[in-house]
UniProtKB/Swiss-Prot annotation:
InterPro entries: ArchSynthase1/Queuine_TRR, TGT, TGT-like_sf, tRNA_ribo_trans-like. Belongs to the queuine tRNA-ribosyltransferase family. This is Queuine tRNA-ribosyltransferase. It is an enzyme of class 2 (transferase). GO terms for cellular component: cytosol. Its cofactor is Zn(2+). Substrate binds at residues 92-96, 146, 195, 222. It comes from the Bacteria. Gene3D superfamilies: Queuine tRNA-ribosyltransferase-like (3.20.20.105). It holds the Pfam family TGT.
Length: 390
């Protein structure tokens, strides 16, 4: 099931405040969804995710099909029982991962033939197979199988003709995904994915075709795939707000804090990205006042937490009181710099907790601003604070 209630709109942008009801719970939008590729958000316990305000997380259809496999997943009743997460889950279709295999795969109208990256077995992914896998996973939101249109094809920018061919196949796969989803009697919700590369006319065609299929929700795919930032922003400005207003809109794989706030202004309700978790493991920390590189030697003796305004466990400890509010229970930059230098696993665990908390809290601030009718002021303050630097 899926029910989307549009609660409030912003008069000066396309931003919306909504509520999404799914089989495993209610999600307040706009929302950021942490990525749990292999059935876990790397380095974070489910309890910690709930404490920091995560309402819905992602799982990766392709990787969970490879390992542990459908037999094991089915024995646990799906992904929720396997990873002990009782809130909603969205699974991608596996299309992006198959596309990423490059020379190891062959895409045809029927589907994708590829060699398993785990053991080399010859495998086949089709819209029908993707729906069958995601039905076993029992995710609340299922994504159609699509072909991710690359920004470059054979060393040149993907032409309009190449993008059209890819988009039209994704459109046909959307229909096959929908037919199989219904045949299986899946009780969850299937989203269609708008493709078309960097060509607005193709995006418009894809969008209209998917709207005619009447999916419960829609995603904008094929962005953040190597294109220049200005071209990504142009697609964000063009496509999301043209999707049906009474259904949720999901921007796949985006992005920085600035991208999220801009995406909300462009009419997006749902975001996911590996950036907060991956960057945390590589020493880049997102803070209210800009990005911090914890490996920089200047943090070696710094007593401040990662973000003096933050109330996450890394920055505020068990008290939950930020440094700016007088709290001194959080871990210092000096300590986290030390953990990183020594390769201690606690380091990336704490920085991941912080980065995810930052993203989730940013979305809470956006929701609060939309409810209060001051989203424009919130955006201006956000930009000014992020530009200040740490």
């Amino acid at each position: 099931m899926l029910q989307f209630d549009l609660l409030k709109t912003d008069p000066s942008s396309h931003a919306r405040r909504g509520q999404l009801t799914l089989n495993h719970g209610v999600v307040q939008t706009p929302i950021f969804m942490p990525v749990g590729t292999y059935g876990t958000v790397k380095g974070v316990m489910p309890r910690s995710l709930q404490e920091m305000g995560a309402q819905i997380i992602l799982g990766n259809t392709f990787h969970l099909w490879m390992r542990p496999g459908l037999d094991i997943m089915q024995s646990f009743g799906g992904l929720h029982g396997f990873e002990k997460w009782d809130k909603p889950i969205l699974t991608d279709s596996g299309g992006f991962q198959v596309w990423s295999l490059g020379a190891m795969r062959k895409i045809t109208e029927e589907g994708v033939h590829f060699a398993s990256p785990v053991n080399g077995d010859k495998l086949f992914m089709s819209p029908e197979v993707s729906m069958q896998i995601q039905t076993v996973l029992n995710s609340d939101i299922v994504m159609q199988l699509d072909e991710c249109t690359p920004y470059e094809t054979n060393g040149h920018k993907t032409t309009e003709a190449e993008a059209r061919k890819s988009m039209e196949m994704s459109r046909r796969w959307a229909k096959r995904s929908s037919d199989e989803f219904q045949r299986l009697g899946n009780p969850n919700a299937l989203f269609g994915i708008v493709q078309g590369g960097m060509y607005e006319n193709l995006r418009e065609e894809s969008l209209q075709a998917l709207v005619e299929m009447d999916f419960p929700g829609y995603a904008v795919g094929g962005v953040s795939v190597g294109e220049p930032k200005d071209e990504m922003l142009a697609i964000m400005a063009h496509t999301p707000h043209r999707l049906p207003a009474h259904k949720p809109r999901y921007l796949m794989g985006v992005g920085t804090p600035e991208d999220l706030v801009q995406g909300v202004a462009d009419g997006v309700d749902m975001f996911d990205c590996v950036m907060p978790t991956r960057n945390a493991r590589n020493g880049t920390i997102f803070t209210r006042y800009g990005d911090l590189k914890i490996r920089n030697a200047r943090h070696k003796t710094d007593h401040q937490p990662l973000d003096p305004s933050c109330t996450c466990h890394a920055c505020a400890g068990t008290s939950g009181v930020s440094w700016e509010q007088g709290g001194r229970d959080g871990f210092s930059r000096a300590y986290l710099h030390h953990l990183d230098r020594c390769g201690e696993m606690l380091g990336p665990m704490l920085t991941t907790i912080h980065n995810l908390h930052y993203y989730l809290n940013l979305m809470q601030e956006v929701r609060n601003a939309l409810e209060a009718g001051n989203f424009t002021e919130m955006r201006a303050r956000f930009k000014a604070e992020r530009a200040r630097g740490v």
